Amino acid sequence: LFSPDKRYGTWRRLWVALARAEHRLGLPVTDEQVAQLEAHVDDEIDYAAVAEWEKKLRHDVMAHIHVYGESCPDAAGIIHLGATSCYVTDNADIMIYRDALLHIRSELVSVIAALCDFAYKYRAMPTLGYTHFQPAQLVTVGKRACLWAQDFLLDLDELNFVIDNLLFHGCRGTTGTDASFLSLFDGD
């Protein structure tokens, strides 16, 4: 999930989405160029070539653009057209974070379900309850497990809130302004 292949593969998917959108919006991006990007989106990434390009350019995103462009030469000129680096870096990270949070949520739901089963199974088994770390009165193991589950349910609510409010950063031009896109679209 947090591997280089996942991160840079997501960059490639974002470049395909950008090219597809730019084509639909009338920029000089052809169906053939988009198809070529799509055909090579899952190709193995040549990290040695990326390192060489990065050494020359001193720019990680541009290094990946060049390496991806080598595998789809007809589309090389439209990869990342008009976008800022943050379009791929930040949005890919958000997509990866979302995948991670969804995985955590799935595991958390499993823990809650297991605690519910445990609470039901031990609903009548007595145990000593405590207050302020002092022995107080009898409770059941099942009740105690319900309290643990309640804490996890609160965590689940917060996790759902974060997932629901994790926003894609959109697409901006170079330096985070719209200047490059305004230029590409002749000021419109």
What is the predicted role of each segment?
Residues 1-188:
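A helix-coil-helix interface module used to build multimeric assemblies
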